[in-house]
From Swiss-Prot:
Name this protein carries in UniProt: DNA polymerase I
Superkingdom of the source species: Bacteria
Catalytic activity: DNA(n) + a 2'-deoxyribonucleoside 5'-triphosphate = DNA(n+1) + diphosphate
Functional note: In addition to polymerase activity, this DNA polymerase exhibits 3'-5' and 5'-3' exonuclease activity.
Assembly and interaction partners: Single-chain monomer with multiple functions.
Keywords: DNA damage, DNA repair, DNA replication, DNA-binding, DNA-directed DNA polymerase, Exonuclease, Hydrolase, Nuclease, Nucleotidyltransferase, Transferase
Family the entry assigns: Belongs to the DNA polymerase type-A family.
Gene Ontology molecular function, alphabetical: 3'-5' exonuclease activity; 5'-3' exonuclease activity; DNA binding; DNA-directed DNA polymerase activity
Pfam families: 5_3_exonuc, 5_3_exonuc_N, DNA_pol_A, DNA_polI_exo1
Entry's EC annotation: 2.7.7.7
Xref: InterPro entries: 3'-5'_exonuclease_dom, 5-3_exonucl_a-hlix_arch_N, 5-3_exonuclease, 5-3_exonuclease_C_sf, DNA-dir_DNA_pol_A_CS, DNA-dir_DNA_pol_A_palm_dom, DNA/RNA_pol_sf, DNA_polI_exonuclease
Domain 3'-5' exonuclease: 312-468
SMART domains in alphabetical order: 35EXOc (SM00474), 53EXOc (SM00475), HhH2 (SM00279), POLAc (SM00482)
């Protein structure tokens, strides 16, 4: 699954206020040379730096309150009344906090008549749209924000100053308070909020409010059944304060439809303004921040650094091509990211002293390319469009940076900053983005390319030194670079796709959708927009009176998990679930794949080699790794993927590779023994964990539960998570996990040791020394630390499995080349390799692929490969 954008939304007003009081007892110590108090600025910067390092957001916005008067004060005049006067020492710092935020490349925003909560809630709602791909982290000191948590949004509440946060997710909220996000609003309505000065219901505190909501589910349902309560003072208060309770509910509800003048695109994180930031630090007296800026690649923070002069030669004829040296760098520029559809717009080569730039593509046919570049795979594909075969290089700066650190992107501007080799503007600053993407004037274009060459040339020595220190140089030379060549060949080859088959599948889906629509209308008793959650909610929960599971910020939740719980209560729900699944296949894969078919009748996906933190490959334009296979309509999509003439598709898939890797690195004798004897590992686990003596007595359900335990342990699952997955009690889930570790003690030891190693070193490694940094392994926040521990446990397993697959692909490509075989590698999907194999080579190549994959690496247990062939990908799988 492709990595999501990470949106960080910060309640600037709340966090800045807490920052001020975090260092309030040192107010006189924190002063700028001009006498300005700086304690809030300093603490806010410290908090922000920590968040940026931990979350690594792609998009950030800091929201501020615009003033005391908002639409809520119009509803309730005393809203936020009675607060103490804001200290002057804090008020004077706010403008400078905002100035600092701007220089850090972060957007801040405020909106008249609305609070920061509403800005954040509205942007969070935008990030839920189906056509965007965001995970959202909200940071605040205000618990009201908890109502915004959902599957893609977590809320971190500052607990102590600005250094410690409590992370809320739907699961954590349910575990801690027994509430859903919408119920949290109702809790605030009942108990009121002394900070915001609305009273709720007299004498109802958190404990009573929770008890009422656990009994009645919602504020509305409570008041519909208030007469059923026993006579008491609480009942009298509820009845007397009904109007205030519902007003408090309105006041507590965050407005997710505020009329913002910005969108998600405006939250994109920009480069720091190094020169201005350095000057700001000087003015504030922040010497340690200035020192870190210099250490992080800010250089001498002056105007000269930002606009450091660069000299280059513009080449129009072939005379200078002969001057290319093997030790030089070369770089090819395109305007868009999808290089299968883009053309080279300019290129550059040279070293830190002498640089050449050109737009004359004819020169490329005469060039003897240097041995250093950035993104070899992209260059190999682009040059193939000109019938030029680029030899494999010795150094790829993009891949080197990826191996050194996966916690930030691998752009050349990032390399410039991390390795302190000068300032480089981002491509976004030069070319624009979205609809504003365009080539600049040649003068700007050539200057930018020349600066890229200089950064790459200056950074190489530092990058190689770090690779050698980390024992990773072999990963670059023996794995990632050869793999880049294999992937380039696969991308250039592409896979044939039948548009007619896709259209036929599409027509079948449309018929099914039309039939399902009629059935749903009949069962519902009226026509409505099935794709509208709001209209669907009215049908299910008001007309059909189905029990309300949970609510969203805008009404009834009709999420998949909610509908699955209701499926047994009404036949219309099962039909709606089926409709949704088919509709997604139709829109995303049938209609989505057809435009991706190139003129040669093939789809040429792009494999992203430098994205995931574990080393796994991802696929984009289109993503062929996410075609659904659990649904027949999804599997049918694979019928459109076909071999070349007189060939078959061969699918070879590693069996349970991650569990085999776990057996090897944990050295657990029982797991090793099961694999060595060819036992069904899930059946074996069921017998050991559930106390079943004979394999034939293991039921399908036993095996399914054991499988969930096996893979759950690999991913560091908790008893809470396992209980949800299996539909059992937490007590039973805890017993399963404890018994598992008793039966497989080597796994328990591995998990304890790898977490300890991560704490000591700050990173974990695969069997090939691929590193993943674990920055939160010592976090004080329980949830953050727990996630880091699970990541530490899983990363060596998943990463080692990914490395094994890469080794197999490299060896297989080499073997096919040596045999001068006509068979070709086409796709890599998860643990599966797909080849196009001529019929006359089929038996030999099947044996070769199986042997090559199973012998890719020697483990304590055998690797096992399952293979199938077919006239379509559907048949081969």
């Amino acid at each position: 699954m492709e990595d999501k954008n990470r949106l960080l939304l910060i309640d600037g007003s709340s966090v800045a206020f807490r920052a001020f009081f975090a260092l309030y007892n040192q107010l006189d110590r924190f002063k700028a040379p001009n006498g300005l108090h700086t304690n809030a600025i300093f603490a806010f910067h410290t908090m922000l730096s920590s968040l940026m390092e931990r979350i690594q957001p792609t998009h950030v916005l800091i929201a501020f309150d615009a003033g005391k008067t908002t639409f809520r004060t119009e509803m309730f005049a005393d809203y936020k009344g009675g607060r103490s006067k804001t200290p002057d020492e804090f008020r004077e710092q706010l403008p400078f906090i905002k100035e600092m935020i701007e220089k850090l490349g972060i957007r801040h925003y405020e909106l008249a008549n609305y609070e920061a909560d509403d800005i954040i809630g509205t942007l969070d709602k935008m990030a839920e749209a189906p056509d965007v791909n965001f995970d959202v982290t909200i940071v605040t000191g205000d618990k009201d924000m908890i109502q915004l948590v959902d599957g893609n949004t977590r809320v971190e509440i500052s607990k102590k100053g600005v250094a410690e946060f409590e992370e809320f997710t739907p699961d954590y909220l349910l575990e801690k308070m027994g509430l859903t996000p919408s119920q949290f609003i109702d809790l605030k309505a009942l108990m009121g909020d002394s900070s915001d000065n609305y009273p709720g219901v007299t004498k109802v505190g958190e404990k009573t409010g929770l008890k009422l909501l656990q009994e009645f589910g919602s504020l509305e349902n409570l008041y519909e059944n208030v007469e059923t309560l026993k006579a008491s003072k609480m009942k009298d208060n509820l009845i007397a304060d009904k109007e205030m309770a519902f007003l408090s509910q309105q006041l507590a509800t965050i407005n997710t439809k505020a009329p913002l003048e910005i969108g998600l695109e405006d939250t994109l994180l920009k480069e720091k303004n190094v020169a201005e930031l350095g000057q700001f630090y000087d003015e504030m007296g922040f010497s340690q921040f200035k020192s870190k800026l210099l250490a992080d690649g800010g250089g001498e923070v002056t105007d000269e650094t930002v606009s450091e002069e660069i000299k280059f030669e513009i080449v129009t004829d072939k005379s200078s091509v002969a001057s290319v040296n093997a030790d030089d760098f070369f770089y090819l520029e395109t305007l868009g990211e999808n290089y299968h559809r883009e053309q080279i717009v300019a290129f550059a080569w040279g070293n830190s002293e002498k640089i050449y730039v050109s737009k004359n593509l004819d020169l490329l046919t005469e060039m003897k390319f240097p041995e250093n570049t950035y993104d070899f795979k992209k260059n190999r594909v682009l040059l193939s469009h000109l019938n030029i075969e680029l030899p494999l290089v010795k150094f790829d700066a993009m891949l080197a940076k990826y191996l050194i650190s996966t916690t930030e992107d691998n752009k050349i501007s990032t390399i410039a900053r991390l390795f302190d080799v000068g300032h480089l503007a981002t491509d976004e600053e030069i070319f624009g983005k979205g609809t504003k993407l365009a080539l600049p004037d040649d003068e700007i274009l050539f200057d930018h390319l020349a600066r890229k060459i200089r950064v790459l040339a200056r950074a190489k020595e530092k990058m190689m030194a770090e690779l050698i220190e980390n024992e990773q140089e072999h990963l670059l030379s023996d794995m990632e670079l050869p793999l880049a060549e294999v992937l380039a060949k696969m991308e250039i080859t592409g896979i044939s796709v039948s548009q007619n088959t896709l259209e036929e599948i599409g027509a079948e889906n449309e018929e099914k959708l039309a039939s399902l629509t009629r059935e749903i209308y009949d069962l519902a008793g009226e026509e409505f927009n099935i794709n509208s959650p709001k209209q669907l909610g009215v049908i299910l929960f008001e007309k059909l009176q189905l029990p309300v599971g949970k609510k969203t910020k805008t009404g009834y939740s009709t999420a998949v998990d909610v509908l699955e719980d209701l499926a047994a209560l009404s036949p219309v729900v099962a039909k709606i679930l089926e409709y949704r699944q088919i509709n997604k296949v139709q829109s995303t894969y049938v209609k989505g794949l057809i435009p991706q078919i190139a003129d040669d009748g093939k789809i040429h996906t792009r494999y992203v080699q430098d994205l995931t933190q574990t080393g796994r490959l991802s696929s984009v334009d289109p993503n062929l790794q996410n075609i659904p296979v659990r649904l027949e309509e999804g599997r049918k999509i694979r019928k459109a993927f076909v071999p070349s003439q007189d060939s078959l598709l061969l699918s070879s898939d590693y069996s349970q590779i991650e569990l085999r890797v776990l057996a090897h690195i944990s050295a657990d004798e029982h797991l090793i023994d099961a694999f060595k004897h060819g036992a069904d590992i899930h059946t074996s686990t069921a017998m050991r964990v559930f106390g079943i003596e004979k394999a034939e007595d293991v039921t399908a359900n036993d095996r399914r539960n054991a499988k969930a335990v096996n893979f759950g342990v690999v991913y560091g699952i908790s008893d809470f998570g396992l209980a949800r997955n299996l539909g059992i009690t937490r007590k039973d889930a805890k017993n399963y996990i404890e018994t598992y570790f008793e039966r497989y003690p080597g796994i328990k030891t591995y998990m304890e040791n790898i977490v300890r190693e991560a704490r000591d070193k700050g990173f974990v490694e695969t069997m090939s020394h691929r590193r993943r940094k674990i920055p939160d392994i010592n976090a004080r926040n329980f949830n953050v630390r727990g996630f880091a521990e699970r990541t530490a446990i899983n990363s060596p397993i998943q990463g080692s499995a990914a490395d094994i697959l890469k080794i197999a692909m490299i060896n297989l490509d080499k073997a096919l080349t040596e045999r001068q075989s006509k068979s070709k590698l086409l796709l890599q999907v998860h643990d599966e390799i797909i080849l196009d194999v001529p019929l006359e080579e089929l038996e030999d190549i099947k044996a070769l692929v199986k042997q090559t994959m199973e012998e890719a690496i020697e483990l304590a247990v055998p690797l096992k490969v399952d293979d199938n062939t077919g006239k379509t990908w559907y048949e081969a799988k």
